[in-house]
Amino acid sequence: MKTKITSISSLLLIALFANCENKNKSNQSTAETTKETKTTNQDSARVNGTTCDITISGIHFTKSVNGADTLATADANGKVTFKAGAKKDYFCDPNEKLSNNTAPILLSKIDNKKPFTLISKVTPEFTKEGLYNAGVLYIYVNDNFWQKLCFEQDERGKHRVVSVRTIGTSDDNNHDIVTTPSIYMKISSDTQTIASYYSYDKKDWHMVRLYKNNYPSEIWVGISNQCPVDKGSLSYFEDLSLVQNSVTDFRMGN
């Protein structure tokens, strides 16, 4: 009889242990699923900012990042004056020392399954103390996935075309030096390829950057002004346009 009781007790202990182990696995699985869900939500196409309703030169801007809707104004001819306060930049530094995501950006949502071209004449306010001052065109997916094309002041006081692509962290590419106060800048996609260009006359284009369009079906494009070091600046955008076609020659930009 004693042997039978001992056997039954052993079986009960084994069953209880197995049940506890299954519960632990279930709880662990639930926790992992929750963690994955949170991570997925954090990595979704989230854009910081607020909803706005601004139309400039036929472009409907519906997202304002860092108060851009209060800092960009357009005259009757569509010329945009874009203010930026002191130390406003947008850059995800690889070592995080220079990360700063405070620059104002005005964004318009577009269908990335269709070709598009964003163009503007850009005139930044360059000053002696205005290191990295720039007028900027953007492609924007979320806060950690974007590209900007800048007409920017460099460390030697030169003015040049600069491109930055961010996938988690930002790269930083200095391109040609520009000696005129204004240039035309363009970002174009045929749905497969995206390229960035600049021009002095809106006729002869110089390619700056080209890569595969691996952005999702809906993205944002827009304009911005940045002033990472100085006390504030202005940038001007003229002849702003957004059309549903792409360049036909990606090397020449026409």
Where are these regions (language model features)?
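Bacterial N-terminal signal peptides that target proteins for export
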Residues: 1-8
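Hydrophobic helical h-region of N-terminal Sec-dependent signal peptides
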Residues: 10-13
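C-terminal motif of bacterial Sec signal peptides marking the signal peptidase cleavage site
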Residues: 16-19
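Bacterial signal peptide processing site
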Residues: 21-23
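Extracellular glycan-recognition regions
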Residues: 25-254
